[in-house]
Amino acid sequence: MKKLFVLNGGAAVKPGNKSAFLKIDDPLSSFSRGGINTGDVLVYDAMLKALAYDQIKNLQFAHAGDEKLWPQEDYDATVIRGSNYLTETVDISNVIPLLKKLKGPIVPVGVGAQAAKYKKLELPKGSVEAWKIIADKCETIGVRGVYSAEVFNDIGIKNVRIIGCPSFYRNLRPSIEIRPIDPAKARVGLTLNRYLSADYASNATKTNRMQRALIQAVAQRPVNRLYSQGEREETLAIFAKGEEKQKHIQSILEKYNLDGDKDVEALVSDRMQAFFDVDEWAADAKENVDVLVGFRLHGNVIGLHQGIPAVFFTYDSRIRELSTLFAIPSVEVEDYMPINLENIFEKADFSKVQHVYRLNYAEYHRFLTENGLNHVLANPVTAPPKKALEKPNLVQTDQNLGEVTDWFQDEVGYMTGEIQTLRDRAWKLELALRELKAPKPNAKLAS
């Protein structure tokens, strides 16, 4: 019997050990406490599909300090589910005692760095120590792209292999065929990220304004749909009823300054979906969308691995790194231009994606094999790449001068209003502080 120990899997596993899902009986109760990133579940699901083990035990990083939860028997291998572990705020030092105790290989699959921009990261000392222990216990660490490899190199870890994210290979096939797009009639699937800040976006203002414009563009087609990737308000809006549902819908509209936009309200109210089972999520995308767009990494990958074309809107190192590695067409939010979906779909070049996928698949196959993991991947149809891609496949659209002028006039008007709002708030705060500092009349009498 082959046994696999998983660190930070983050989901339940179906019988047969090939599918992951979130076991949520009461979505309203669960999501009232906060959002749950279902993209992480997709990564775990893809790993399960690629690996072949009879017994699987998972332990989350958050509970790794509890020795009572440590495995009491030896496992053939340990894998770490890929995620954004390489940041200046994520400290995994609590996992060090467990890492030292575990026998056999410890193989991270799809580790990535996350920052607003490509830059040198100052990782927590505990994380550096943990990654060096892991590096000594595997042949190679699987990383998402060139930037993540550079971050490891900066802390002295050289044994890395650039594989992307395992979710891209969920279909287990050595090649994919991207479907053609009919720009005028394509059914569009959209994902959003409501919690972008300066820590995770090179320009949070541009990113959120671009999301607003994209929502409006997608909402204009009644066949289009919105996927919640575990966002709190979105998921609550799907499962709540009556006034409670309307309250969450209103919160979403206000977040993007779209209160009163009936098209967007209809999209959010009637055509928004959420899935806790990855198999069901993938099946819905396959049946109901022709192209995916948006601001969530795995919201696009759920289609891409099935041959459904997708266009990324890139705003941080993570999205830029992975879209570049697979030559996926992308719109850079820093360019900050008006959104015309038909124009984007017409200009998006997917000609490289199929070729690059075959190369990256071969690298993933080599990575799993060299680390001694028991896997079911078919043999590659080509050799791995000599060098990972580093140049993004940006969508170059033809902009109408009138549309661009109107766009920037509206944006300047919005920004001006926001500045005035901030000034008003600052003035009210100043008045309140003055009032607090002013001597009280009763105090003078008492003295």
For the regions a language model picked out, list residue spans one by one.
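Active-site anion-handling motifs in enzyme catalytic cores
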Residues: M1-S447
